[in-house]
Amino acid sequence: NETLYIPIMKGIDDKEIIILREKGNVMNSNLKGDVKIVINIQNSTHFKRDGLNLHFEKEISLKESLCGFNFIIDHISGKQLRYNSEVGVPTKSGLIKAIPGFGMEREGNKGSLCIKFNIKYPDKLTAEQIDKIKEIL
């Protein structure tokens, strides 16, 4: 019997295989087998991973998309990131904003945090609201 210590590197991928050479069954006095470990990562966050990039979806209102907004993201690093939209520049539905350096890290490389904005439109507008929008736009 031997206790095996598995080196899990930062940023390891789901389904990645770690091979520990000659740590498996003894075939004969000169030959030992390998131990293969398959990594199974269970995501319990609101982020989705794509390589080194992290993806996050943010729903905003029509008003926020037109007038600007800000919000805080609780990042997996434990840091809180504040996102401020650009005032005067409408945020389009489906826009993806990449923030370099806030993705996963592996072997000195860092991915991006990619925020996709989805706009929630009102179910109905009153005649008065429609007139105001027409007047403004």
Where is each model-derived feature located?
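Intrinsically disordered, low-complexity linker/assembly segments
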Residues: 1-137
